[in-house]
Curated annotation (Swiss-Prot):
Keyword Nucleus: no
Keyword terms, alphabetized: Endosome, Membrane, Transmembrane, Transmembrane helix, Transport
Oligomer and partners: Interacts with PRA1B1, PRA1B2, PRA1B3, PRA1B5, PRA1B6 and PRA1E.
InterPro entries per the UniProt record, alphabetical: Prenylated_rab_accept_PRA1
GO CC field: endoplasmic reticulum; endosome; endosome membrane; Golgi apparatus; trans-Golgi network
Compositional bias segments (type: Polar residues): 12-27
Membrane spanning stretches: 83-103, 105-125, 146-166, 170-190, 196-216
Function, in words: May be involved in both secretory and endocytic intracellular trafficking in the endosomal/prevacuolar compartments.
A Pfam family annotated for this UniProt entry: PRA1
Name assigned to this protein: PRA1 family protein B4
Stretches the record annotates as Disordered: 1-27
Length: 220
């Protein structure tokens, strides 16, 4: 006689209770808003386009093209022509000087980064439907703007951030003027220059002009 099949034991299959943590995580807004990502992407693309228009560094450092200007007016003309030709290179050098000055002053760099992050994430790219709540108090956009202005005044004028930035920019301007005054521009093809609006720092205007309408419309 065939053996009987073993009895089937009942197996309980408890229903898993969905955790509320994922829903709470999903309900939180992303840190990087679409406007902020768009702003960063536009700045990145425009910086790449600006750097692609820089002149060869060997041409900038050509010692055979250096000569003493005949007069102050001649030096001014040279500075204007050389700046029009080496605009991207000059601004790159000035930016490098400012960056080096901030790196050698880490506290100033930290203060400046905190100030920039505060403006970006607490005001410019913060969703309007998410007010700032601190110590149980809700801050309006006007109060947030006032606090950021006071924080900016404190960082720039009551710390060494302002002096570091001003001294670095003065050094950069002095180097640019010295090179522009002693660099003879006779061998430069100035007729091939782009309009002044296409300079390296125009990404500030271009990126800001694209992001500003959305931010202003959201704040109004």
């Amino acid at each position: 006689m065939a053996s009987s099949a073993p009895p089937v034991l009942p197996i309980s299959n408890p229903q898993t209770v969905p955790s509320a943590a994922p829903s709470s995580v999903e309900s939180q807004p992303p840190i990087a808003t679409p406007a902020f990502r768009n702003f960063i992407n536009q700045i990145t693309e425009t910086v790449k386009n600006g750097l692609s228009k820089r002149r060869p560094w060997a041409e900038l450092a050509d010692r055979s093209a250096l000569s003493k200007p005949e007069s102050i007016s001649d030096a001014a003309v040279r500075i204007r022509k050389n700046y029009s030709y080496f605009k991207v290179n000059y601004l790159t050098v000035a930016t490098a000087i400012v960056g080096f000055s901030l790196v050698t002053h880490p506290f100033s760099l930290v203060f400046l980064l905190c100030l920039l992050a505060s403006w970006l994430f607490l005001y410019l790219f913060r969703p309007t439907d998410q007010p700032i709540v601190l110590f149980g108090r809700t801050f309006s956009d006007r109060e947030t703007l006032g606090c950021l202005i006071l924080f900016s005044i404190f960082v720039i004028f009551l710390t060494d951030v302002g002096s570091v930035l001003v001294s670095a920019m003065m050094i950069g301007v002095a180097l640019i003027c010295a090179h522009g005054a002693f660099r003879a521009p006779e061998d430069l093809f100035l007729d091939e220059q782009e309009p002044a609006a296409t300079g390296f720092l125009s990404f500030l205007g271009g990126a800001a002009s694209s992001a500003a309408p959305a931010v202003i419309a959201a704040r109004v």
